[in-house]
Every structure is written in structure tokens, then in C-alpha cells.
């Protein structure tokens, strides 16, 4: 074995040496940094050294190095402008925001009525049946045990409220996200425009974009749904674009050569081939939406998130852990239903 490894090392050394020699002899391959990069690096290095030396050698002589030069009025004026802009937007777009609120409330009220007013045994059986059909009998048994946990500990109604809010946000995100992803897959410039916006939606802390949502829609369930959509709605768009761009070009060319129309190409070729990846995006949207349950409770959403929030406020460790486990079980059940046998 030692001799074999030694021979492999000698052969590999010769091969790598030849490749390195070829790389050095090839003038078309750029080596090192460009002259402009060297000059910029030297220039900024000198600036850093000079100002750092001045600051630590004469700390009181050059005061502008201690604090960034600004004026308090700049922030006050900026705050005033933003508040004026929001007040104007609320007044001018009152009917627009009311329409959005009405649409969200309609879906949410229907789902809450469905999950809360329907007998628990019907919902229990339906969820177990869906999980069994999607992921198999073992997953159905597991989901039944998760639901039994919520019922025995008194979390049933809270869990149904949470699932209703989550399904509202996920449903709206999906029906808006998939068409948007289809449109972006054929419009690279538009996708390049909205991609930074989606990055902003996912990276910005929820407490920051919670402020304009409350300013436009107030506190309550509508604001909770919108906050959940902002954070959890982007994966379905990204995955739809990725899935449609990954459809083999030879398959599309074959369909076009047989006279397939754009609608036929989309519905019979692209979407069926892209469906597994799109469903992965749907799964990510559902699970990311569920992570906003506790944050949504800060703006008036009830459910399991409120239980966790109260446990944090009163340092009730037991209540927080039990409610957190219930949220985890909701996520696992939804994951099994959406993903099916892939995760079984």
C-alpha cells in the first residue's frame, strides 16, 4: 500500500508540474493583479496608514477623525420627510390598502372558519389522510401522533389558528410567486431588477419591514399575513425561475419543431419537467412562513406564536418549550404533505 501511494504521488507530481509549466507559458491566461489594482491598493493603504498614525499620535488635534462629521438636523429632517411621505401614502392609497386588507381577510376568515368550526376529528382525519396519501402510511401515523400531542396539551385551537394564518400567507405567496417566476424566466432584465428586491425582503430583519406594514395596515391578522409573505414568499419565485431555466433545451426544441404553441410549451413541457423543483420552492415558502409565527404574534396574530411570546415575556420555560414543539410538529406535518415521499 505504501509503495502504491508513493507511485501515485510521483505520477501526480509530474502531471501537476506539467500543467503548472503550461499555465506559466500561456500568455492568454492572466496572472496576478492588474496595474490599476496595484495602484489602488497602494493608494488606499497609504491613506489608512497616514490617518491611523495621525489619529493615535495626535488624538485631540484632528477631531473630525474621532466622529463621523454630521449634524443632528440631518436625521431629524430625514425622519420628518419619511413620516410625511408615509402619511401622504396612507391618505392617498386608503382605498388600495383597504382592498388588499379585504382580500386577505376573506381568505383568512374562510380558512379559520374551516379549521376552527369543523369538528376536530374531521380535521384530524383529513390531515392524516393527506399525509398518508402524500408520504405513505408511516408518515400518516407520525402526523397523527403530532396532532394528538397538540390536542392533549390544549394546543388544538391555537394550532388551527396558526395553520390558517400560515396557509393564507403561503397560498397568496404561491399564487403570486409562481406566475411571477414564470414571467421572470422569460424576462432576464426584469428578473435582474427584482432579484435585489427579493434579497432585501429575505435579509432585512422582520422588525424593520414591520414598521411600514403597520403604518399602512395597522396591527392585526392582515399585517401578520403580509409580514409572513414578505419573508417567506421569495423562494417560490427563485425556484420557479431556476426550474424553468433548467428545462433541457433539446426537449423544448423538439416540442417547437412539432408545432407546439407557447401555451402548450409552458403547460405541457416546461411546467411538468420543472414541477419537482417548483414544489421544493413551495416547500421552502411554507416552512419559512412558519418561522415567522412568533414574529407575527407581535402585530396581533394569535396562535402558537402568541404562546411562545407570552412564555418569553414571563419566563415560562415549560409553556415556551411545549408551544415551540407544537410549532415544530406543524412544520413537519406540512413538510410531509408538500414534499411527499422524498423526505419519508
PLM-predicted stretches and their roles:
Residues 67-120:
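Interfacial loop/helix-cap signal at membrane boundaries in integral membrane proteins
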Amino acid at each position: 500500500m505504501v509503495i502504491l501511494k508513493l507511485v501515485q504521488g510521483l505520477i501526480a507530481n509530474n502531471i501537476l508540474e506539467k500543467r503548472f509549466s503550461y499555465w506559466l507559458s500561456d500568455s492568454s491566461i492572466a496572472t496576478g493583479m492588474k496595474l490599476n489594482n496595484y495602484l489602488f491598493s497602494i493608494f488606499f493603504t497609504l491613506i489608512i496608514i497616514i490617518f491611523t498614525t495621525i489619529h493615535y499620535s495626535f488624538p485631540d488635534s484632528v477631531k473630525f477623525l474621532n466622529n463621523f462629521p454630521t449634524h443632528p438636523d440631518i436625521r431629524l429632517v430625514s425622519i420628518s420627510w419619511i413620516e410625511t411621505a408615509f402619511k401622504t401614502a396612507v391618505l392617498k392609497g386608503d382605498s388600495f390598502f383597504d382592498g388588499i386588507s379585504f382580500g386577505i381577510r376573506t381568505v383568512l376568515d374562510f380558512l379559520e372558519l374551516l379549521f376552527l368550526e369543523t369538528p376536530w376529528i374531521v380535521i384530524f382525519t383529513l390531515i392524516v389522510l393527506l399525509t398518508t396519501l402524500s408520504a405513505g402510511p408511516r408518515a400518516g401515523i407520525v402526523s397523527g401522533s403530532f396532532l394528538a400531542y397538540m390536542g392533549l396539551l390544549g394546543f388544538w385551537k391555537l394550532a388551527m389558528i396558526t395553520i390558517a394564518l400560515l396557509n393564507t400567507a403561503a397560498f397568496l405567496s404561491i399564487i403570486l410567486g409562481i406566475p411571477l417566476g414564470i414571467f421572470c424566466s422569460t424576462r432576464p432584465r426584469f428578473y435582474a431588477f427584482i432579484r435585489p428586491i427579493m434579497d432585501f425582503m429575505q435579509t432585512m430583519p422582520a422588525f424593520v419591514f414591520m414598521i411600514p406594514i403597520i403604518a399602512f395596515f395597522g396591527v392585526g391578522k392582515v399585517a401578520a399575513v403580509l409580514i409572513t409573505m414578505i419573508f417567506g414568499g421569495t423562494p417560490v419565485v427563485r425556484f420557479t425561475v431556476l426550474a424553468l431555466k433548467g428545462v433541457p433545451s433539446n426537449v423544448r426544441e423538439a416540442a417547437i419543431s412539432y408545432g407546439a404553441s407557447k401555451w402548450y410549451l409552458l403547460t405541457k413541457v416546461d411546467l411538468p419537467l420543472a414541477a419537482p423543483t417548483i414544489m421544493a420552492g413551495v416547500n421552502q415558502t411554507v416552512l419559512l412562513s412558519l418561522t415567522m409565527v412568533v414574529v407575527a404574534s407581535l402585530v396581533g396574530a394569535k396562535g402558537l406564536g402568541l404562546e411562545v411570546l407570552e412564555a418569553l415575556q414571563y419566563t415560562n420555560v415549560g409553556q415556551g418549550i411545549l408551544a415551540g414543539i407544537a410549532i415544530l410538529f406543524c412544520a413537519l406535518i406540512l413538510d410531509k404533505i408538500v414534499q411527499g415521499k422524498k423526505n419519508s
